[in-house]
Swiss-Prot record:
Species of origin: Oryza sativa subsp. indica
Protein name: WRKY transcription factor WRKY28
Annotated region (Disordered), positions in chain: 157-178, 306-335
Residue ranges of DNA binding: 245-311
Function: Transcription repressor. Interacts specifically with the W box (5'-(T)TGAC[CT]-3'), a frequently occurring elicitor-responsive cis-acting element. Regulates, probably indirectly, the activation of defense-related genes during defense response. Modulates plant innate immunity against X.oryzae pv. oryzae (Xoo). Negatively regulates the basal defense responses to the compatible fungus M.oryzae.
Recorded GO MF terms: DNA-binding transcription factor activity; sequence-specific DNA binding
Any one Pfam family match given in the protein's UniProt record, by short name: WRKY
Factors inducing expression: Induced by biotic elicitors (e.g. fungal chitin oligosaccharide). Accumulates in response to M.oryzae.
Length: 403
């Protein structure tokens, strides 16, 4: 049996060595123990020395080199001897390769492609929106220029009409109606500017979804027609009168209230302004002025139509008497006399049925006009509330106030 001896550095024998000493060796992180074998011949009483088998020693060396018997901390990892030529891979990379490596799903790839397509489309839409925003101020400026030009043309046309008409004052409502009509006519007859020519041509081939613009234009045209229908009907009547009579009163069967008188430019005789006594329910107004050609003829201009019947005290007998009285006068030589005679003949030829039908149509037209007037309801409510407050018993009966 081999005997373990201390290393030669501790004790050096003085006699020739009779032992074979094998120092400890380090092989890849492991140590082998030191061994000493005796080389001197054995005594007859001692057992024979062991025979050293070098194949057994090589087997032990290979067994010691196994990684499973090493004492380092790289448990289960590849041996460092086998990876000595290549650099060691980090542990994070090995963990990611073992646990985080998975195959991409086809649905995920499809979603990524869809997201990329949507982002590209959003970029294109953003560019288009920026272009539209950049072009908007230019188009707005063109529209403003067109509107200002149309307004200036309308104002000029209104001034020209007021200067060429008969020299009386015009009410603000008539001025507003004229300005609106002139604006509509200017917008209707205005030539389209070059940026809007293509839009007008494309409107002819518009799809059903684009018919809203056409319907809006039709609605505007209908409103214009309704506004023209709502204009007060203007009629004139010529009556003989005494030149010395300065009252300018024309008896037509209705009651009137005079609210003004002024001298016009084209006629030295003054013009009187009357309003129906049923106002504001009845919107009819009357202007009376002597003719510039003949002082014996009064020209009565009526604006609108009465929405009520004549007062009851004005009967048919007075009408016939007045007609006979007018017929006794000699007709004036001017053109107004012919008009007066024509009106008298038409009134004599018209029967009672025609007058009733005319009154019925007049009532229907006035009712339609009042229902379309936004201020009619407010005026009616104000009048009724004032009348109710006047007739309220709390203001007249003190006994009710004590209660």
């Amino acid at each position: 049996m081999a005997k373990m001896l201390p290393p030669p550095s501790q004790s050096v024998p003085s006699r020739p060595p009779s032992w074979l000493y094998i120092p400890p060796r380090r092989r890849h992180g492991t140590f082998t123990s030191s061994c000493a074998f005796r080389l001197s011949p054995s005594s007859p009483s001692s057992p024979p020395p062991p025979v050293l088998d070098f194949q057994y020693i090589q087997f032990m060396d290979s067994w010691i080199e196994q990684t499973s018997l090493s004492l380092d901390l790289n448990v289960g990892l590849p041996s460092t001897a086998r990876r000595s030529s290549a650099p060691a891979a980090p542990i994070k990379v090995l963990v990611e390769e073992n646990f985080l490596s998975f195959k991409k799903d086809h649905e995920v790839e499809a979603l990524e492609a869809e997201l990329r397509r949507a982002s590209e489309e959003n970029k294109k839409l953003t560019e288009m929106l920026r272009a539209v925003v950049a072009k908007y101020p230019e188009l707005q400026g063109q529209v403003n220029d067109m509107m200002s030009a149309a307004a200036a043309a309308a104002v000029n046309a209104g001034n020209h009409q007021s200067s060429t008409s008969e020299g009386g004052s015009v009410s603000p409502s008539r001025k507003r109606i004229r300005s609106v009509d002139s604006l509509d006519d200017a917008a209707h007859h205005r030539k389209p500017s070059p940026p809007f020519v293509a839009a007008a041509a494309a409107a002819a081939y518009a799809s059903p979804d684009q018919m809203e613009c056409t319907s809006a234009a039709a609605a505007a045209a209908a409103k214009r027609v309704v506004r023209e229908d709502c204009k007060p009907k203007v009629s004139k009547r010529f009556v003989h009168a005494d030149p010395s009579d300065l009252s300018l009163v024309v008896k037509d069967g209705y009651q009137w209230r005079k609210y003004g008188q002024k001298v016009t430019k084209d006629n030295p005789c003054p013009r009187a302004y009357f309003r129906c006594s049923f106002a504001p329910a009845c919107p009819v107004k009357k202007k009376v002025q002597r003719s510039a050609d003949d002082n014996t003829v009064l020209v009565a201009t009526y604006e609108g139509e009465h929405n009520h019947a004549q007062p009851p005290h004005h009967d048919a007998g007075s009408k016939t008497a007045a007609a006979a009285k007018h017929s006794q006068h000699q007709p004036p030589p001017s053109a107004a006399a012919a008009v007066v005679r024509q009106q008298q003949e038409q009134a004599a030829a018209a029967g009672p049925s025609t007058e009733v039908a005319a009154r019925k149509n007049l009532a229907e037209q006035m009712a339609a006009t009042l229902t379309r007037d936004p201020g009619f309801k407010a005026a009616l409510v104000t009048a009724l509330s004032g009348r109710i407050l006047e007739l309220s018993p709390t203001r007249t009966d003190p006994s009710l106030e004590r209660r």
